């Protein structure tokens, strides 16, 4: 197998946005989990919540993809100059030779859970406001 060059990395997690807060948390042996109140849960839950994700505005042409998961992806593009590094690599090598590898998240699931709560009582149809293919679908973030 031919080795691949990795020329830019970043991370956006409950530890913070970018590599610096991630490294700091690892060195300090600090978790990103915090006790949270969540929806209608009656007991406290320790969650890894990405700060600032709810305030992110996606580009106008990608509004159909608006969900927490894709807002976190947008934060990743903005962190550590990652989007600029991808553009530079595409310019240098051609877009067909550049790959972006993504981790997974369940952060978009709440939007789908809320949609299921509002299904049509007679038909069972989900609300038109749920853009499943652009938000909860497994491939949503890579399409975004």
State what each model feature region is:
Residues 1-144:
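Conserved "HGTGT" condensation-loop signature of ketosynthase/thiolase-family condensing enzymes
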